[in-house]
Design a protein with these regions (language model features):
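The feature marks the mature, well-folded catalytic cores of soluble enzymes
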Residues: 1-271
Length: 271
């Protein structure tokens, strides 16, 4: 058996742990409640929550007056929240506080007449939700998209910009993106909104991957931060495997391996 180096940062991050606990408490208090979509990006945890009386609504229209719904850790569209509350649906906001901060930064930028720029995955629920807190956010998935936008119109360089990041964005990708904007544009405010847990997890994963023969990353395939951990590990280790559970591991993967590394995404429980 190879020696195994386990990442100390593995396990639920604060925001995910908080959302799961809030959902469980709400279900106990109400005798059953709803989550709108997946509360977190972990199929096994979502299935466990369903067994505890937390049903999944596929659409806001599935909820009626008097229902209680727990808002997922990634946040929700502002228009959806306004609609639910307007129809008498009780919303328990389990949005990660770090995501709430980004929502407020974007809303404040709107009030100040500034253009919001989000560095992250355009279709990720967190990014889509954050973008809804202003009229029109620019979403860039990296420095190449930033360069393309700048090349479209010379006047873009004169627009007052407020730049934020998806909480699970890769640190180097965010930095390389805002550095271009800071260099090329005349009025830029930059907020590093990558959460500390994400930064710590990414740094530790890179350190471990550089010391091992093989690296295993555990997390749901829908999880952005798990995908990013895998990408980071691949830069330091040639043999990296992303799995959702131990059943996906094959003994053959560890052939010739003396030291193996193990880390996990923020939506993966430690136990």
């Amino acid at each position: 058996m190879p020696e195994v180096i386990l990442a100390k940062s593995a396990g639920f991050c604060y925001g995910v742990k908080r959302a799961v606990e809030m959902a469980q408490q709400t279900a106990e208090q109400t005798g059953g409640c709803w989550m709108l979509g997946d509360l977190i990006h972990n199929t096994h945890v979502v299935e466990d929550l369903a067994r505890r009386g937390i049903r999944k609504a596929a659409s806001p229209s599935d909820l009626k007056a008097g229902d209680t719904v727990v808002i997922r850790s990634h946040g929700e569209l502002k228009s959806v929240l306004d609609d639910l509350e307007g129809r008498g649906v009780h919303c328990v906001n389990a949005t990660c506080p770090n995501v709430c901060r980004i929502q407020m930064l974007v809303a404040q930028a709107e009030q100040e007449g500034r253009q919001s720029v989000i560095i992250g995955e355009p279709h990720h629920p967190e990014v889509v939700g954050v973008a809804s807190w202003c009229r029109h956010a620019l979403i860039f998935d990296g420095p190449e998209a930033v360069k393309m936008w700048l090349s479209e119109d010379p006047h873009n360089r004169e627009i007052p910009l407020t730049v934020v990041a998806q909480t699970t964005c890769i640190q180097k990708l965010f930095e390389s993106s805002w550095e271009i904007l800071k260099k090329e544009c005349t009025n830029v405010k930059i907020f590093d909104t990558i959460c500390n847990a994400t930064h710590k997890r990414q740094t530790e994963a890179a350190e471990i991957a550089g010391k091992v023969d093989v690296m295993v990353v555990v997390g749901d395939r829908k999880s952005a931060n798990t995908k990013h951990l895998t990408e980071i590990c691949l830069r330091r280790c040639r043999r990296v495997l992303q799995i959702e559970n131990a059943d996906e591991l094959s003994p053959d993967f560890f052939n010739g391996c003396s030291v193996a590394g193990l880390t996990a995404g923020a939506s993966t429980p430690a136990g």
